[in-house]
UniProtKB/Swiss-Prot annotation:
Protein name in UniProt: Exodeoxyribonuclease 7 large subunit
Keywords: Cytoplasm, Exonuclease, Hydrolase, Nuclease
Cellular location(s): Cytoplasm
Disulfide bonds: none
Gene: xseA
């Protein structure tokens, strides 16, 4: 029976290998649905499980390289849809599925509906940034549309109490899951707009499956969000969850807690910022006052140097010096005359001529008179010169010039304006009058 020369003899390994090749070629890619059972995850990171329906089951494996990119983690009893190829585990001869992608059953239909609605609303412009309303600068009252007993409202209130306990919160309770949940959400958005009692709305809930979050993908809700006069922050699910509400809302927050942080100022940060600004303003004021005080002292010093009183004081000092010198010269002259007289007296006494004595006495009296006249003349000339200099100084005094109706015009850099060429349109001018200053601007 086994001696026919054309009969091929297989080994078990060869048979399993060729069956494997046939299976992988014939069923290279297929999509099927079933229930997960016997799900295990060994240390290797691969997933091993069975996929079954009410009449049959098949073993399946999903390698770590594929399952680590999955956002969905299956559990026993879950209905799933998988994309896989058929293969054979050669050592045992078991045929199995090699799964490349997995999602909850029905999620594929949800995704198709989601993508179709997203494209249509985007084409209408509902997601455009042109229509996004900015959050108010000063928020005093916040409205929250969510379940009154869910985790989302607890997270929001916790964050607001920590960051800005002074803010008021108004809760608009609504279902956030189920067939008619979107209708309640729409009703509360419209109610908040009618009451107009809050500055901003937070629309959200905690995480969940795609089916749990589906009410936030409803077209009617998207249009209600778009038509809202109040700015809306969408905070649905976790950071990896994205809904139509997120796209159409004015602002999207990754989580309800993140939404609370977006709409609430950090009181301590604001206090620190105000303190810094006040300190900077005070320092700038002190610095400016110090500079102005130094400038005023410099101007006062310059005015003192130019004041006519100082000029008069200098001339008076010079007059005193001349008077002292003249008196000294007079004393010296008298001293010399006395010496001469003293020298002549013995000679006269020796000659004893009365006539010469009388003449000498007369000459002496004349000389004394002339000397006194010369002294008075010198003093009168000095006084006249001093008066003349004082009059000249007084006539050219800046204060007297200003008193006659004249003025001095300077730029804001204290440069005296002598010609129209010294200024240009827009310059600030300072005009000094006898009783104050005027500030003006060059117009033409």
């Amino acid at each position: 029976m086994f001696s026919k020369p054309l009969q091929t003899i297989y080994t078990v390994s060869r048979l399993n290998r060729e069956i494997r090749a046939l299976l992988e070629q014939g069923f290279a890619s297929l999509v099927l649905t079933g229930e997960i059972s016997n799900f295990i995850t060994p240390a290797s990171g691969h997933w091993y499980f069975s996929l079954k329906d009410d009449k049959a089951q098949i073993k399946a494996a999903m390698w770590r390289g594929n399952n680590r990119n999955q956002s969905y983690r299956p559990i026993n009893g879950a209905q799933v849809t998988v994309k896989a190829r058929v293969s054979l585990y050669e050592p045992r001869g078991d045929y199995q599925l090699i799964v490349e992608h997995m999602e909850p059953a029905g999620e594929g239909q949800f995704k198709q509906e989601f993508d179709a609605l997203k494209m249509r609303l985007a084409a209408e412009g509902l997601f455009s940034s042109v229509y996004k309303k900015p959050l108010p600068q000063n928020i005093n009252r916040i409205g929250v549309i969510t379940s009154a007993t869910g985790a989302a409202i607890k997270d929001i209130l916790t964050v607001l109490k920590r960051r800005a306990p002074q803010l008021e919160v108004i809760i608009y309770p609504a279902m956030v899951q189920g067939k008619d949940a979107h209708l309640q959400l729409i009703k509360q958005i419209e109610l908040a707009n009618i009451r107009s009692e809050v500055d901003v709305l937070i629309l959200g809930r905690g995480g969940g499956s795609l089916e749990d979050l589906w009410c936030f993908n409803h077209e009617q809700l998207a249009r209600a969000i778009f038509n809202s006069q109040l700015p809306i922050v969408s905070a649905v699910g976790h950071e990896i969850d994205t809904t139509i509400s997120d796209y159409v809302a004015d602002v999207r927050a990754a989580t309800p807690s993140a939404a609370a942080e977006l709409v609430s100022p950090n009181t301590q940060e604001l206090h620190n910022k105000v303190t810094q600004l006040v300190n900077r303003l005070a320092n700038a004021f002190k610095h400016d006052m110090s500079e102005k005080r130094a400038q005023a002292l410099q101007l006062q010093h310059r005015l003192n140097l130019c004041h006519p009183r100082n000029q008069l004081n200098q001339k008076a000092q010079r007059l005193d010096e001349l008077s002292i010198a003249l008196q000294q010269a007079m004393r010296n002259s008298l001293y010399q005359q006395e010496r001469t007289l003293n020298n002549l007296t013995p000679r006269l006494m020796r000659q004893s001529p009365d006539k010469k004595l009388t003449q000498a006495s007369h000459q002496l009296a004349q000389l004394q008179t002339r000397l006194n006249q010369a002294i008075q003349q010198q003093l009168q000339q000095a006084n006249n010169s001093l008066a003349l200099q004082a009059s000249r100084l007084d006539s050219v005094s800046p204060l007297n010039v200003l008193a006659r109706g004249y003025s001095i015009t300077k730029t804001d850099k204290q440069k005296v304006v002598k010609s129209v060429a010294d200024v240009k349109v827009g310059d600030t001018l300072i005009t000094e009058l006898v009783d104050g200053t005027l500030h003006s601007q060059v117009l033409s």
